[in-house]
């Protein structure tokens, strides 16, 4: 949604269920969504982005990062903010196998954590609150009742069982 607000011509999403993909397209206004559980992600990206991916925001890592690096456009960018697919892996994950595309496509890949931009929090909160208030940003909350259910709520993040921000109501 922010990409669209900031001028992106085409916005695609990748999610793990048909329901989440429909939400991305029907409610959030994405141009298309790919279900990584049931679709050929690489093939769909080739169809939807015939010139490659200009910008990929990654919170997942693993196979999805690999596939997207393989579909990078000339001077494409990859922003890394998470790697949730690897967090519970018993072994250390290897780097992406398509990293050479960063060289051949003259791409850039950079990681960050939200605290890197703490000096911009107030400004961002003001701007995003305005977008929410005027309906340009939509969101869902997945509310779990009771502190005793907090571990289950946290696990939803790793299994994809949530739709929206997970909140534990006490």
Which residues make up each language-model segment?
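Mid-domain Rossmann-like dinucleotide-binding core that forms the NAD(H)/NADP(H) cofactor-binding site
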Residues: 1-38
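Glycine-rich phosphate-binding loop and adjacent beta-alpha segment
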Residues: 8, 24-25, 63-137, 170
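Short, well-ordered alpha-helical microsegments
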Residues: 21, 42, 65-66, 151
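Local beta-strand N-terminus motif with an aromatic residue
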Residues: 30, 52-53
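Short acidic-hydrophobic, aromatic-tinged amphipathic segments that line or gate anion-handling sites
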Residues: 31-37, 142-149
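N-terminal Rossmann-like NAD(P) cofactor-binding module of classical short-chain dehydrogenase/reductase
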Residues: 34, 54-57
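Short amphipathic alpha-helix with an adjacent loop that forms part of the alpha/beta core around
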Residues: 40-51
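C-terminal capping/lid region of NAD(P)-dependent oxidoreductase domains
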Residues: 136-143, 151-170
């Amino acid at each position: 949604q922010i990409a669209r607000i900031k001028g992106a011509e085409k916005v695609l999403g990748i999610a793990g269920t048909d329901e989440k993909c429909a939400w991305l397209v029907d409610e959030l206004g994405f141009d298309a969504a790919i279900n990584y559980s049931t679709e050929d992600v690489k093939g769909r990206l080739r169809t939807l982005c015939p010139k490659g991916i200009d910008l990929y925001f990654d919170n997942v890592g693993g196979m999805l990062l690999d596939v997207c690096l393989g579909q990078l456009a000339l001077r494409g960018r990859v922003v890394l903010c998470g790697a949730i697919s690897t967090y519970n892996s018993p072994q250390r994950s290897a780097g992406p196998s398509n990293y050479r595309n960063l060289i051949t496509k003259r791409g850039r890949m950079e990681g960050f954590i939200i605290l890197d931009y703490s000096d911009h929090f107030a400004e961002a909160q003001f701007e995003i609150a305005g977008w929410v208030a005027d309906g340009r940003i939509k969101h869902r909350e997945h509310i779990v009742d009771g502190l005793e259910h907090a571990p289950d709520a946290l696990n939803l993040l790793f299994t994809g069982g949530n739709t929206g921000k997970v909140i534990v109501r006490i």
